[in-house]
Amino acid sequence: GRSSLAPDSKEEVGFLPENPYFYKFLTGAETVSFYGRLCGLSGKSLKAKVRELLELVGLADAADRRLGGYSKGMLQRIGMAQALVQSPRLLVLDEPTAGVDPLGSRDIRNIIENLKGRGMTVFLCSHLLEQVQEVCDRVGVIFKGLLIAEGSVNELTRDSDKQEILLEHASPELMERLKEMVKEDGRAVWLEDGHPRNSLESVFLKSLLEWKEKHPNPES
């Protein structure tokens, strides 16, 4: 309802660019505090905000480490913290998981889900369509600067010409009976059957979890 040119309208917006630049000699807490002061925060309210945001993005344990020792995923998360420091109503994220390993990518998506649960509007720009499908409610497809498709994830991904049935513990005999029923129908076509596949990311995360369960103290 306000002009985007008005300076005060930008107070409602947080932004994380694809490749944010931070002062590597500052710690995580100092970085968030720096941006908080730029937004007019000070004193106890600033300290409380810094603690809250570092906890939110999972960097409370790294609050006193310099950014020069942060991984790419940690830098992206500290970037999300600075984008949230003024408690915006709209958060704009440009390729937030670009160059981030699968574990760090999952952490960032969990943060986005957390923010959605708090009622914040998150505008996400990404070429990683699998991640978009996981976290977004509505999607717009842009090609050469034009919006060529828009809708909910379910609307855009649903294939209305097909029906999908997911069975567990189905015996070979049951599968054969189902195929015979399809043949008898005369209109339906049995396209394929087999075991569902997991994404490589889910395989990686599952393997990592299993390894951690077997090695609870890897440094010992």
What are these regions (language model features)?
Residues 153-220:
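Short, charged/small-residue-rich alpha-helical element at the C-terminal edge
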Residues 1-124, 129-143, 148-149:
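ABC transporter nucleotide-binding domains
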